[in-house]
Amino acid sequence: TVSVISGASGSGKSSLIKLLNGVIPQFVNADIKGDIIVDDDDISQKDVAARSDFISTVFQNPKSQFYSINTTDEIVFALENRNLPKDEIVDTVKEYTEILGTKKLLDRDIFKLSGGEKQLVAITAVACMKQKVYIFDEPSASLDIDAIKRLKSAIKTLKELGKIIVIVEHRLYYLKDI
């Protein structure tokens, strides 16, 4: 399932993302009324850590969430933090870089990548987590047309894998046939 959220600046798109991934209310003080249901599960009372078991977010500027300068190190970072066995990490990275067509981005300097390549590294990193829900905040921002095509392909692939994808976006043209 792919859901697209679009709206004017200040309409609450970023707030919705923060509600879904738990930043609100854990790190941003806010009064919340009602429930937040994701895939028939009320996540309203779950903290960021609990939500990270099934929700991953790729921010508009992926380099703001990078922890390493090497792309492979970046992709395996979260898997290592979950104490997965090394052979499982290697197999997962191999599987998802093949599925997403990002194998050529392994073992590269993140600072030498284009904006689109950085976005694909971030998507590969979260895809390797095998989450149920992926949230993409303005994923096409500052990408050229070729990078948008690769982004679209990655989103289609995640959809085909049965993932729930929430996209906050202003550029809607590339999402029409996903």
Residue ranges and their predicted role:
Residues D87-L105:
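Conserved ABC ATPase "signature" region
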Residues V126-A127:
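ABC ATPase C-loop
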Residues N21:
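Helix-to-loop junction immediately C-terminal to a conserved catalytic motif
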Residues E169-H170:
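H-loop/switch region of ABC-family ATPase nucleotide-binding domains
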Residues D35-A50:
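ABC ATPase NBD Q-loop/coupling interface
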Residues Y134-D137:
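Catalytic Walker B motif of ABC-type/P-loop ATPase nucleotide-binding domains
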Residues I145-A147:
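Helix N-cap at the start of a conserved alpha-helix in ABC-type nucleotide-binding domains
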Residues D109-L113, E117:
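Conserved ABC ATPase signature
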